Amino acid sequence: MRDFKNIKIAVAGTGYVGLSIATLLSQHHHVTAVDVIPEKVEKLNNKVSPIQDDYIEKYLAEKPLDLVATLDGRSAYADADFVVIAAPTNYDPVKNYFDTSLVEEVIDLVLEVNPDAVMVIKSTIPVGYTRSLYVKYAQKGVRKFNLLFSPEFLRESKALYDNLYPSRIIVGYPKILDRLEFAEENEAIRSVTDVNMLQEAAKTFAVLLQEGLLKKILTHSSWV
């Protein structure tokens, strides 16, 4: 069983989802926020929010956050226990399609530099997407693939507030489902990860989210 101590976290994306999570988690843990826009990285390293959010602005200015920002995803992910993926997934209503290409770019880089890391998708994704990734990457011959999903329930400009006072916390992990139609997914999951370890990782991540809350709530770890 993997031991999660002295946890280091990387967050891919500094939009309202990624930056609010990075701010929340950096109250108690070292967090590296990764973005591709130099101006956003520079602002964050100067304790200035690149997005409009009163609570993020206040926390960056007044709280002793253990938060740094970088353009170098490779280095950030190589040193992380958890990689939170908050890359944009733009939705096309005409095609009824989420563009998940940026999510998979992050996954590919994490697998290249740190396959032991536990990845947590916070981006908005289609139903069944997480399990489909287990099949996709198992077919690619990947030997380790540790992926969780934790949906966000945030409002723009109120993202950190909603993380500090959440209505619920959900962290999903893959489960072996005893039905014939899930046989391919089950085989893929077994081939690339330790489900028991991921269940513990899901519980650990839920605890990390709870540590910085201003409102204590019950959490829910479930399968995806």
Residue ranges and their predicted role:
Residues M1-V224:
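Structural/interface elements that position substrates and couple domains in central-metabolism enzymes
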